[in-house]
């Protein structure tokens, strides 16, 4: 007994002594940990002077008196992880997540042999992943995510950690391939590897991790194909491989993953069909396939999955939306936007009682919106924008008692906006780009939840009522491009939450209400293109948060307010300020007068200033140079005087500077050479003098420079040749002297060069003639001499103007240099030569006149022969081939006449080639005349248009075509080769088009189906759009065709289309677009607005082109008896009626109907309907039309 007592006491004291030593060591380690921190005060409870045990300190947990857990997450601890932590021998959990630790993991940590949980996520740790992890055999949970680890995954990670059940290395900078040893982790259930730079294929050994439940590796660089062994993961519940360039199809073997609940393959560059085998995944709740290139229909087998979420946006899925969707009884979100689904929206969607989010935007859906859509009342967000939906929305959404967002933009919905929409809990209502008519219901403004209401590009009319002030929650109101009238109500000032107000392109009148200044949250105010009058209220421009102010195209008068928004006065550019509509100040096209306020120079965050086309006077304030963020400054079209401030060279971000059409004088500042970002510089039509600064050669980004119509002088600097991106250089009508620098031949991007009407001398540099991209060269009216170089553009009279240089010689100017070089030494010899020539001409003319009179007597009784004789009577008149003109950048230029008669062809050749304009050679009728086929000597076939005398507009048409076609060269425009004018006779010579007109093929050509198939029709649509887009946008001034129709689309031997017959075309100058009292166009193609206004626009051409697209897709004429029962009695009305009835497919030409081509045909129909919008402002421009057609 005594022995046992002694043994017990010995063991007790021995254990106590050991424990005391261990406890002292642990306390020391914890204190060392604290002291190593850069902010130790955050662990204030760790204090050895207190009576509390270290086991009671924050984050410390003990078992049997020893530390087994240290958990200090999200405390903002800073510093490096101290190696002393390895002294905590019994530690099983170490969690330092969500702090600010940096540096590497100390290797001593691997001495913690009992460690089961290691969480170092959310810090700034660096270095390679430590290979010594294999020294922790009991590790179950490892989280190193959200750090800065680099390098590859060491195979030892997977070989020596057999117990590991969760591994997270996501959001680091790891790279390389995944080693096949990953298959050794037989107990792993969670594997997170995303947001790294891993590459290669996922190893097939992944299938050996039999217990894996969650596998997430998004946002890496894995590629396909995916290993079929994934199907062996029978416990897999979540698979996320999104945002990887897999470039493969979805494996059919995924259908064997019966426990799969979440499948996320978003933006994985997937191709092929959605495999029907996915229907075997009976546990699948969330299927996310958006942003891929999947095609085909939705497989029926998906109907058997109890999905909560199905997203497949931005793919190429097609077919109709299946009615079996109604089987998804627990579906919460259905997102199928940006695909190619067609047909009607199935009413069975009402059978999805849990559906909250429905997005079917940007498809080819047609017909009316089914009233059953809101049958369950659960929908909270509906997006049907960008389809072909038609009909009205009366009572359609009455049952949507939970609806907070309704987006219907860019459809063909008509009728009025329902009165009862205000009863819904709507926060966003977007109705842009439809055919809504009538007034905006007053009841809508009673909505207390409405934060966004947009209805631009419709045909809404009426006025804005005072009740608008009741919509207190409204933040965004966009009603641009409608027909709203009246005054802007003062009550709009009550909308203190309003951030964006856009009423552009309406018919509002009166003054801008001062009360708008009470909308203190306004960031964007756009009242442009209305009929507003009066002065700009100071209270508006002083709005503290105003970032975009557009009041252009009104009748505003008075001076510019001197205290713009406080937002503009910020010292630094705020965040997001480079987004669209930030820092814009546009007051152009008004009647504002007085000086530009100096205070504008204090608005340091202004990005764009446009004050053009007003009546502003005085000098340009030097203070504008302080606007260091300015990218565009347009002060053109005013009455500004004085010199250009040299300080403007400080605006280093300036990309566009337009000071044209003012009265500025003095020199061009040398400091302009500092504007390294400048792309376009326009100083035309001022009174500038002096030389062009050599410093402009520093403008390496400049593409267009116009210094024309000034008094600039001196020699042209060779430094201009360093502007390597220059496309257009215009310096005509100045007083430049000296020679043209040959260094300009280094400007390989140059397309337009005009140095005409100066005092330049010397020879034409050969290098300039050989510029590879030069389309137009105007050297006319200088003092140039010598032989014209035989290279490139100088030998092309359609591209080079050389007239007015008397000492030039060579074939192209019709003067032989050798003959001209042999001087006649005797003045008597010259006089004798001239006298002899005169006698010869006199005798010839006298004889010809006698012969003609004799013939006229013989033919007096034959009208047809009299016509032939009259034509033959001027056979000595020359048929001149045109020299080209050029397009140019300034807003307005004078019409360029054709000063270079070349390659003379006798009219007799034309008369003979057409057999005296015989009826058998007629190939068509153009505007105001008949077109004949003619084969000239040399086997050149041309088309000759003989303008009719009976047409009172014949001379106008002739001049219009001359002015237009002589300046334009494009592969999709018919080239005008020559012309002749004698008395009342006028002839135009065009290139001959073998396949005639589109009109001929669509209606008269036998065997049309075999030849004019869908691919050719699409080719014709794209080519014709390309030609018309060039007329509208290829250069300034723009060109309106005014008579676009199928007979004016000609086809060459390869069915490449070319736009023809510019008989009604006219150049638009800066403010000229009115036609004569004669309505332009051809019946069936005339836009509706031409019957109400004398103003011709490019949007009128777009409408006519929309009719041509309809002809191509339907095979029908624009007018005819087939349309008697249709609205408007024409093809357009018939097509709209069919589409509104949900029968868009019936519009397609029956000869072309094909399941494979239906989507592209419906897409062309959709583009046509956009072009045919009744309101011009709703129509796209031709560049947008061309882009859309090319994407089919």
UniProtKB/Swiss-Prot annotation:
Keyword Disulfide bond: no
Major subcellular site: membrane
SMART domains, A to Z: LRR_SD22 (SM00365), LRR_TYP (SM00369), S_TKc (SM00220)
GO molecular function: ATP binding; protein serine kinase activity; protein serine/threonine kinase activity; transmembrane receptor protein kinase activity
Enzyme kind, highest EC tier: transferase
Catalyzed reactions: L-seryl-[protein] + ATP = O-phospho-L-seryl-[protein] + ADP + H(+); L-threonyl-[protein] + ATP = O-phospho-L-threonyl-[protein] + ADP + H(+)
All copies of domain Protein kinase, residue ranges: 917-1192
Official protein name in the record: Leucine-rich repeat receptor protein kinase EMS1
InterPro entries: Kinase-like_dom_sf (IPR011009), Leu-rich_rpt (IPR001611), Leu-rich_rpt_typical-subtyp (IPR003591), LRR_dom_sf (IPR032675), LRR_N_plant-typ (IPR013210), Prot_kinase_dom (IPR000719), Protein_kinase_ATP_BS (IPR017441), Ser-Thr/Tyr_kinase_cat_dom (IPR001245)
Sugar attachment sites: 47, 171, 187, 208, 259, 414, 435, 555, 629, 682, 711, 746
Organism (species): Arabidopsis thaliana (Mouse-ear cress)
Function: Receptor with a serine/threonine-protein kinase activity required for the specification of the correct number of male archesporial initials and for the subsequent specification of tapetal and middle cell layer identities. In seeds, required for enhancing cell size and the rate of embryonic development.
Phosphothreonine modified-residue sites: 914
TM segment ranges: 828-848
Pfam families: LRR_1, LRR_8, LRRNT_2, PK_Tyr_Ser-Thr
Amino-acid positions noted as binding ATP in the UniProt annotation, renumbered to this chain: 923-931, 945
Effect annotated for changing residue 1185 to E: In exs-1; male sterility
Residue ranges of LRR repeats: 64-87, 90-112, 114-137, 138-160, 163-185, 187-209, 235-257, 259-281, 283-304, 330-352, 354-376, 378-400, 402-425, 426-447, 449-471, 473-496, 497-520, 521-543, 545-567, 581-603, 605-628, 629-651, 653-675, 677-697, 701-723, 725-748, 749-772, 773-795
Family to which the UniProt record says this protein belongs: Belongs to the protein kinase superfamily. Ser/Thr protein kinase family.
Domain of life (superkingdom): Eukaryota
Localization per Swiss-Prot or TrEMBL: Cell membrane
GO cellular component assignments: membrane; plasma membrane
Modified residues (Phosphotyrosine): 990, 1085
Single biological process term from Gene Ontology: anther wall tapetum cell fate specification
Keyword flag Zinc: no
Posttranslational modification: Autophosphorylates in vitro.
Expression by tissue: Present in young buds, open flowers and siliques but absent from mature leaves and roots. Strongly expressed in the young organ primordia, and as the anthers and ovules developed, became focused in the microsporangia and in the distal and chalazal regions of the ovule. In cv. Landsberg erecta, only expressed in the anthers of young floral buds.
């Amino acid at each position: 007994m005594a022995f046992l007592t002694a043994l017990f006491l010995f063991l007790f004291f021995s254990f106590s002594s050991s424990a005391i030593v261990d406890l002292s060591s642990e306390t020391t380690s914890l204190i060392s940990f604290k002291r190593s921190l850069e902010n130790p005060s955050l662990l204030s409870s760790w204090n050895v002077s207190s009576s509390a045990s270290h086991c009671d300190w924050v984050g410390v947990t003990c078992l049997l008196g020893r530390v087994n857990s240290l958990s200090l997450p999200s405390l903002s601890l800073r510093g490096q992880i101290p190696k002393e932590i390895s002294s905590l021998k019994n530690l099983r959990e170490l969690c330092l997540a969500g702090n600010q630790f940096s540096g590497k993991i100390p290797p001593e940590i691997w001495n913690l042999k009992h460690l089961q949980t290691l969480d170092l996520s959310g810090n700034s740790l660096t270095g390679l992943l430590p290979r010594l992890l294999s020294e922790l055999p009991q590790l179950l949970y490892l989280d190193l995510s959200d750090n800065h680890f680099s390098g590859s995954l060491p195979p030892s990670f997977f070989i020596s950690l057999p117990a590991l059940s969760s591994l997270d290395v996501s959001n680091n900078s790891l790279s390389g391939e995944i080693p096949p040893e990953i298959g050794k982790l037989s107990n792993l259930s969670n594997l997170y590897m995303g947001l790294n730079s891993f590459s290669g294929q996922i190893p097939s050994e992944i299938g050996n991790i039999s217990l894996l439940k969650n596998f997430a590796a998004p946002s890496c660089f894995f590629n396909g194909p995916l290993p079929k062994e994934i199907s062996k993961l029978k416990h897999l519940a979540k698979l996320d491989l999104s945002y990887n360039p897999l470039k493969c199809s979805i494996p059919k073997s995924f259908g064997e993953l019966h426990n799969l609940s979440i499948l996320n393959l978003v933006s994985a560059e997937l191709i092929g069909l959605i495999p029907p085998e996915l229907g075997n995944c009976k546990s699948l709740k969330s299927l996310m396939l958006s942003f891929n290139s999947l095609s085909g229909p939705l497989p029926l087998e998906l109907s058997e999955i109890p999905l909560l979420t199905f997203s497949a946006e931005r793919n190429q899925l097609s077919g109709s939306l299946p009615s079996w969707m109604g089987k998804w009884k627990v579906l919460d979100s259905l997102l199928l936007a940006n695909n190619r689904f067609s047909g009607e929206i199935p009413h069975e969607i009402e059978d999805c009682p849990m559906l909250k989010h429905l997005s079917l935007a940007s498809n080819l859906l047609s017909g009316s919106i089914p009233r059953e859509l809101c049958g369950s009342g659960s929908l909270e967000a509906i997006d049907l924008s960008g389809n072909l939906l038609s009909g009205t929305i009366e009572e359609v959404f009455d049952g949507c008692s939970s609806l907070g967002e309704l987006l219907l933009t860019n459809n063909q919905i008509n009728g009025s906006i329902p009165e009862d929409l205000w009863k819904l809990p709507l926060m966003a209502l977007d109705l842009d780009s439809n055919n809504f008519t009538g007034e905006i219901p007053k009841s809508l403004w009673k909505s207390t939840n409405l934060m966004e209401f947009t209805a631009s590009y419709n045909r809404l009319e009426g006025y804005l009522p005072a009740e608008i002030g009741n919509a207190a929650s409204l933040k965004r109101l966009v009603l641009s491009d409608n027909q709203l009238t009246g005054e802007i109500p003062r009550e709009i000032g009550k909308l203190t939450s309003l951030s964006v107000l856009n009423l552009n392109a309406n018919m509002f009148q009166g003054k801008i209400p001062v009360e708008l200044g009470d909308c203190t949250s306004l960031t964007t105010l756009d009242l442009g293109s209305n009929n507003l009058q009066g002065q700009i209220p100071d209270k508006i421009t002083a709005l503290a948060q105003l970032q975009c102010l557009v009041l252009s195209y009104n009748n505003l008068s008075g001076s510019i307010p001197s205290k713009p928004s406080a937002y503009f006065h910020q010292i630094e550019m705020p965040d997001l300020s480079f987004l669209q509509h930030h820092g814009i100040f546009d007051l152009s096209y008004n009647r504002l007068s007085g000086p530009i306020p100096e205070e504008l120079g204090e608005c340091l965050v202004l990005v764009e200033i446009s004050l053009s086309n007003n009546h502003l006077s005085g000098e340009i304030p030097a203070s504008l140079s302080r606007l260091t963020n300015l990218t565009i400054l347009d002060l053109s079209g005013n009455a500004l005087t004085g010199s250009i401030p040299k300080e403007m060279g400080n605006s280093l971000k300036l990309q566009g500077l337009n000071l044209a059409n003012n009265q500025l004088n003095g020199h061009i500042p040398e400091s302009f050479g500092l504007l390294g970002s400048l792309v376009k510089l326009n100083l035309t039509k001022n009174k500038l003098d002096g030389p062009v600064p050599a410093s402009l050669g520093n403008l390496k980004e400049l593409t267009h420079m116009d210094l024309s119509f000034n008094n600039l002088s001196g020699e042209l600097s060779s430094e201009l040749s360093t502007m390597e991106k220059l496309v257009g250089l215009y310096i005509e009508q100045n007083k430049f002297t000296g020679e043209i620098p040959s260094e300009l031949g280094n400007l390989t991007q140059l397309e337009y060069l005009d140095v005409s009407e100066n005092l330049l001398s010397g020879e034409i540099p050969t290098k300039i003639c050989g510029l590879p991209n030069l389309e137009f060269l105007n050297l006319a009216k200088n003092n140039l001499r010598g032989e014209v170089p035989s290279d490139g553009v100088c030998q092309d009279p359609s591209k080079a103007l050389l007239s007015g240089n008397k000492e030039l010689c060579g074939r192209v100017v019709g003067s032989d240099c050798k003959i001209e070089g042999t001087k006649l030494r005797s003045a008597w010899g010259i006089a004798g030569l001239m006298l002899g020539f005169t006698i010869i001409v006199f005798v010839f003319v006298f004889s010809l006149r006698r012969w003609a009179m004799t013939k006229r007597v013989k033919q007096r009784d034959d009208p047809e022969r009299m016509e032939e004789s009259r034509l033959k009577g001027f056979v000595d008149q020359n048929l001149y081939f045109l020299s080209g003109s050029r397009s140019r950048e300034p807003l307005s230029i004078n019409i360029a006449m054709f000063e270079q008669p070349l390659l003379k062809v006798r009219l007799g050749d034309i008369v003979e080639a057409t057999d005296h304009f015989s009826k058998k050679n007629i190939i068509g009728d153009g505007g105001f005349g008949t077109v004949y086929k003619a084969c000239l000597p040399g086997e050149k076939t041309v088309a000759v248009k003989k303008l009719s005398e009976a047409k009172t507009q014949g001379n106008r048409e002739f001049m219009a075509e001359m002015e237009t076609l002589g300046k334009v060269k494009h592969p999709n425009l018919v080239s005008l080769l020559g012309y002749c004018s004698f008395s009342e006779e006028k002839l135009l010579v065009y290139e001959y088009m073998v396949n005639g007109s589109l009109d001929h093929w669509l209606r008269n050509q036998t065997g049309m189906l075999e030849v004019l198939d869908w691919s050719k029709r699409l080719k014709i649509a794209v080519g014709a759009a390309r030609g018309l887009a060039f007329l509208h946008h290829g250069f300034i001034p723009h060109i309106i065709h005014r008579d676009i129709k199928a007979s004016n689309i000609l086809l060459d031997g390869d069915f490449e289309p070319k736009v023809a017959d510019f008989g009604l075309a006219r150049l638009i100058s800066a403010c000229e677009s009115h036609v004569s009292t004669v309505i332009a166009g051809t019946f069936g193609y005339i836009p509706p607005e031409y019957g109400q206004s004398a103003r011709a626009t490019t949007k009128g051409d777009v409408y006519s082109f929309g009719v041509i697209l309809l002809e191509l897709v339907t095979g029908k004429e624009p007018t005819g008896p087939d349309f008697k029962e249709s609205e408007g009695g024409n093809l357009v009305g018939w097509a709209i009626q069919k589409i509104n009835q949900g029968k868009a497919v019936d519009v397609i030409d029956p000869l072309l109907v094909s399941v494979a081509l239906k989507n592209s045909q419906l897409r062309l129909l959709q583009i046509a309907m956009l072009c045919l919008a009744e309101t011009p402002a709703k129509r796209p421009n031709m560049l947008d039309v061309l882009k859309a057609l090319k994407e089919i």
